[in-house]
Amino acid sequence: MVMTGGGGGIMQAGHEGAGRENSFGLNIQLPFEQQANPIIEGDPKLIHFKYFFTRKLFLLKESDAVALFPGGFGTQDEAFECMTLSQTGKFGPVPVVLIDRPGGDYWRSWSEYIDKQLLHKGLVSPEDPSLYTVTDDLVVACNAITRFYQVYHSSRYVGDRLVIRLKIDLSEVEVEQLNANFSDILVTGRIEKSQALPQEAQDETFDLPRLVLYFNQRDLGRLYQMIAAINNMGTPSPEERGHPERK
């Protein structure tokens, strides 16, 4: 399922690739510029928004991955909203990929600005660039998304504990490696293997193995780095490898 702003250009291309039946369009009501593309026009899954902030909420709320392409102020607004929500734990974890045309420098220049004006001045954490991937290669972009769900499935909080659902069970040695490398993100205790907690009895992911930890809810870049480390552990079967949307 693909969700776009519902307009032309790259938004229409997303709908063409997914097909009308697998597309949502979240259009914005403007007196100029933004018209629904012919793929989604007239479809009940085309939704019109008066305000940008509610549109952004719906774009992100159910998304399992975000792909951003070069654009104007609206694109920058959506990009920084996505980064802010990811950095503060209000959204995700999900893969966020900034995709340019081959040889393009739109996102590379953006990334250089982030490094110079934010990262080097201590306005964001050194790990925050781990929240996103910048590329002009579609293969790299696709791999960044699929690789994010190689072993990691999804996560939620149960009280103060972060529960990370996995597609395969990790070994004790692998969990020990995570504790050795990521103890800095813990408030207390250790990263531990677990089955579903009692509060998850009705969860559709009940049978999946889990990791449970008291995450400090601050170092989200480090959490993304830990997810990357988890995805380098083990090799799920083709049946286990499917995206969370395809349960």
What kind of feature is each model-predicted range?
Residues L131, L138-K247:
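SAM-dependent methyltransferases
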Residues M11-G14, G104-Q117:
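Glycine-rich, charge-decorated loop segments at or immediately adjacent to ligand/cofactor-binding or catalytic sites
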Residues K45-T54, S130-A141:
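Short acidic-hydrophobic, aromatic-tinged amphipathic segments that line or gate anion-handling sites
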Residues L57-L68, Q117-D136:
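Conserved thiamine diphosphate
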Residues M1-I28, F206-P209, I230-N231, T235-H243, ...:
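Glycine-rich beta-alpha loop segments
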Residues F49-L98, H153:
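Active-site/ligand-binding-proximal alpha/beta "capping" segment
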Residues M1, G9-P70:
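Acidic/glycine-enriched connector segments
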Residues N22-Q34, F69, M83-W110, P126-E127:
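Short, acidic/small-residue loops that bind anionic groups at enzyme active sites
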